[in-house]
């Protein structure tokens, strides 16, 4: 029950007090961390790898640059960026959830990604970095879980260098109506059952499906990025808008 005097936000389809959402999201990701990569493949039929590859290709990251992989989870993007920036560059894998951060660290070290990667537990709304630190920031399937998205976008803008760019890869609104209906049926009826079967946690995957529906659509997120200060903001619809990649610059 939320008191009238409290500021509220959404947790999936629930209305909750703002100060409660962070802990509730944390519980979800503590629960799913161990099966996160397996479930990503099952949920997207492996297509998430193509979406992330496209994000890397659009990043413009070069040797010697400094990159922040925010809400980086198990480190898929960090692994790619580590190779791109080379020994003279640096990649920061940041996640608010220590279980996800631990999984990412173990996974990357097991495949030999060491030396130019650092790990930081950080809240996107109050990034613990100096102004003008990063050449590129990515946040992949993480923004929809942030309580105050506008505050997080302003925080990302602050720590970007002039000339730097932000890429937001996130589930969005399908642009083909029959696909939208089929996607809803899959998300709300099949996905929680797969989550229960594979990860023994149908409720967390029900939340993830609901959080996708509550996330701003393509044009709304574009406007939010512009309001945070980003310029030349554009987006690419991927898989007919099931996912969108937004990109904005700090000049």
Curated annotation (Swiss-Prot):
GO terms for molecular function: 2-methoxy-6-polyprenyl-1,4-benzoquinol methyltransferase activity; demethylmenaquinone methyltransferase activity. CDD domains: AdoMet_MTases. Pfam families: Ubie_methyltran (PF01209). Its EC number is 2.1.1.163, 2.1.1.201. S-adenosyl-L-methionine binds at residues 74, 95, 123-124, 140. Keywords: Menaquinone biosynthesis, Methyltransferase, S-adenosyl-L-methionine, Transferase, Ubiquinone biosynthesis. Disulfide bonds: none annotated. InterPro entries: SAM-dependent_MTases_sf, UbiE/COQ5_MeTrFase, UbiE/COQ5_MeTrFase_CS. One of its GO terms (biological process) is aerobic respiration. PROSITE patterns: SAM_MT_UBIE, UBIE_1, UBIE_2. Pathway: Quinol/quinone metabolism; menaquinone biosynthesis; menaquinol from 1,4-dihydroxy-2-naphthoate: step 2/2; Cofactor biosynthesis; ubiquinone biosynthesis. Transmembrane segments: none annotated. It catalyses: a 2-demethylmenaquinol + S-adenosyl-L-methionine = a menaquinol + S-adenosyl-L-homocysteine + H(+); a 2-methoxy-6-(all-trans-polyprenyl)benzene-1,4-diol + S-adenosyl-L-methionine = a 5-methoxy-2-methyl-3-(all-trans-polyprenyl)benzene-1,4-diol + S-adenosyl-L-homocysteine + H(+). Belongs to the class I-like SAM-binding methyltransferase superfamily. MenG/UbiE family. Methyltransferase required for the conversion of demethylmenaquinol (DMKH2) to menaquinol (MKH2) and the conversion of 2-polyprenyl-6-methoxy-1,4-benzoquinol (DDMQH2) to 2-polyprenyl-3-methyl-6-methoxy-1,4-benzoquinol (DMQH2). This is Ubiquinone/menaquinone biosynthesis C-methyltransferase UbiE. It comes from Klebsiella pneumoniae (strain 342). The gene is ubiE.
């Amino acid at each position: 029950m939320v008191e009238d005097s409290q500021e509220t936000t959404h947790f999936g389809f629930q209305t909750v007090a703002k100060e409660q959402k962070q802990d509730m999201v944390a519980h979800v990701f503590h629960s799913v961390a161990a099966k996160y990569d397996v479930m990503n493949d099952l949920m997207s039929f492996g297509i998430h790898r193509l979406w992330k590859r496209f994000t890397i290709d659009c990043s413009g990251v070069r040797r010697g640059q400094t990159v922040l992989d925010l809400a980086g989870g198990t480190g898929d993007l960090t692994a790619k960026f580590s190779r791109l920036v080379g020994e003279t560059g640096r990649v920061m894998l940041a996640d608010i959830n220590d279980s996800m951060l631990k999984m990412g660290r173990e996974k990357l070290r097991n495949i030999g990604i060491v030396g130019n990667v650092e790990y930081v537990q950080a809240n996107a709304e109050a990034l613990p970095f100096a102004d003008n630190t990063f050449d590129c920031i990515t946040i992949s399937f993480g923004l929809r879980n942030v309580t105050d998205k506008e505050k997080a976008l302003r925080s990302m803008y602050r720590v970007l260098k002039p000339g730097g760019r932000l890429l937001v890869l996130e589930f969005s609104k399908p642009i083909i109506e029959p696909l939208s209906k089929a996607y809803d049926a899959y998300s709300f009826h099949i996905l929680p059952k797969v989550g229960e079967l594979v990860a023994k946690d149908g409720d967390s995957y029900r939340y993830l499906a609901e959080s996708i529906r509550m996330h701003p659509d393509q044009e709304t997120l574009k406007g939010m990025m512009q309001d945070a200060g980003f310029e030349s903001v554009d987006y690419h619809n991927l898989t007919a808008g099931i996912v969108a990649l937004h990109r904005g610059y700090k000049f």
